[in-house]
C-alpha cells in the first residue's frame, strides 16, 4: 500500500511538472528574430543590397520551377535567407542560429565535423557548427519521423536499408537505436544537404520540449546555415510543438520591423510569437458577425484581415492563399486564375513566405501592375533606366520633388479580406550617385518582381508574398483554423510591449 502511494505521488508530480513546463502555458512565448544584415557591418550601398536581395528572391522562386526538378514530388522553394532565430537543442547551453523558413518543414543545423560545398560566396554562419549533446539519441528506422524525412518512404524499406532482420521488420521490432533512420537527402531550390535524424530536448523561454526531432548535417551544398522549418509538415517546429502543447503549436505570428535597409532599423529585433491567438473581443474582419455600432477606423486598422489557406497536394507544407487582384490607386487589376486557386497537380496559389525578400508575380499580371503604376508616377518623374539593371528592381524613377505614389492594395479571397500596404513596403526611396561619375540624386523603385511567364510556372507556385511586403504587419498563421491573418502593427513597439 505504501509503495502504491509513493508511486502515485511520484507520477502525479511528474504529470504536474510536464503539464506546467509544456501544456499549461496559456500565454504566448516570445522569441526574437534578427535580420541577417544585423550581424554584418552593413556598409553596402542601397543598390548593392537591392541587387543581392532581388537576386536571392528570383533564385528562390525560379529554381523551384526548374525542369530538372520536376521529377521530385516535393521540393521546398529554398532555405530562407533574411531572418534568424536562435534555438537551444540538447543539454548544451549554447544556442544555434537558424533561418526562419515558412517555406520548408524540417529543422536542421550543421554538425561537427562540417563541410559546406560551394559556400565561398555565402554569408558566414552566425554560430559555429554544433556538437551533438550527450543526451541526443538516434531516431529509429520505424519511426514516423524517419518516414517523413524520407518523403514518406515506407518504414519497412527504411528498416531494410538499416539492416534490420526480416523477422524484426515483419513483427515491428526495429524500433531501437540499433536500427537508426538512414541518412536522408533534403533539397532546396538552390542547395541541398545530407543529414541524420536525431532526437533531443528543445529549450525555449519558459518551456522545455523533450523528444524534439531534428536533422544533423555534416555535408551541405551551398547551405552554410541551418534552417528552422515552420511549414505545415510533420517535422516542422510548430508541428512538433503542437504534439506537446496544442496552444503553442496551433498558431504563431511574427511582426517584421520596417527597416528599408536602414542600418539602425535593421538591427531592431522582430517579435516571433508562439501561441498567438486573436483576442475574443477582436472581431475577424470580413465575417458576417462583424457588426460595429461605431465607425472606429483606428480600431479597424488594428484588426486582423484573414484569408483561408489553400490545400496543396504537391507541396502540403506551403502556406498558400488565394489572391483575387491588386489595386493601384482606384483601379483593380484582377489576378490570373492560377493565383486564385491551386490545381490538382499542385500548381498555383500565392505562398506567404518568410524567406523570400520581394514579392514575385507572374509576368503578365506583373506587367499590368507596372503599367498602371507607371502611368501615374512616370508621367511626372523621369524613368531611372540606368539604375534598374544594377538594382534588380523596376520601374525606378528620379525624384526631384515630392512624389505622389498611388496606394497598393492586395485583395485576398474572403469577404473584405484586403490588405493595404504602407508606401514604404512597395516603393523604396534612396540616394545614388555622387561618386564623381554621376551626380547624387534621389531615386524611388517599385518593390515587386517579375516571376516569369505563366507557362513556365505551371505545376509550381504561382506567386510569392515576400517578407519585405510583410513589414509593419503582424502576420499570424492560424493552423487550427487554417487561415493566415494580417494586422498593421508598430512591430518595434510590439516587441517592447511583449518583452
Curated annotation (Swiss-Prot):
InterPro entries: Aspartic_peptidase_AS, Pepsin-like_plant, PEPTIDASE_A1, Peptidase_aspartic_dom_sf, Plant_Aspart_Prot_A1, TAXi_C, TAXi_N. Glycans are attached at residues 175, 211, 400, 415. Disulfide bonds join 111-119, 396-445. It holds the Pfam family TAXi_C. Belongs to the peptidase A1 family. One of its GO terms (cellular component) is plant-type cell wall. The active site is at 101, 353. Keywords: Aspartyl protease, Disulfide bond, Glycoprotein, Hydrolase, Protease, Signal. GO terms for biological process: proteolysis. This is Probable aspartyl protease At4g16563. Residues 83-487 form the Peptidase A1 domain. Its EC number is 3.4.23.-. Residues 1-26 form the signal peptide. GO terms for molecular function: aspartic-type endopeptidase activity.
